[in-house]
């Protein structure tokens, strides 16, 4: 079962800020999170039922550290369309 601890952060990038005007919030989570799990977490902790959820899996970048190759963590990104007049910033978790 998905938990609130699986949500890493709400992303604030140029693209996500433009999407917020259309009622879409971009959420970064652990790779094991699913759409139904995220929907349950949003309903339980934020009291919000999303209109739609789109997801994509992001592979961690390959980086060099002290001459050796390493990899950043993989994560999932969700685009959550919220109902009119609802935002996650106004709710208390």
UniProtKB/Swiss-Prot annotation:
GO MF entries: rRNA binding; structural constituent of ribosome
A Pfam family: Ribosomal_L23
Entries under InterPro entries matching the protein: Nucleotide-bd_a/b_plait_sf, Ribosomal_uL23-like, Ribosomal_uL23/eL15/eS24_sf
Keyword Oxidoreductase among UniProt keywords: no
GO annotation, biological process: translation
Keywords of the record: Ribonucleoprotein, Ribosomal protein, RNA-binding, rRNA-binding
One of the record's GO cellular component terms: ribosome
rRNA-binding in keyword set: yes
Family designation: Belongs to the universal ribosomal protein uL23 family.
Subunit structure: Part of the 50S ribosomal subunit. Contacts protein L29, and trigger factor when it is bound to the ribosome.
Function recorded in the entry: One of the early assembly proteins it binds 23S rRNA. One of the proteins that surrounds the polypeptide exit tunnel on the outside of the ribosome. Forms the main docking site for trigger factor binding to the ribosome.
Name the UniProt record assigns to this protein: Large ribosomal subunit protein uL23
Species of provenance: Campylobacter jejuni subsp. jejuni serotype O:2 (strain ATCC 700819 / NCTC 11168)
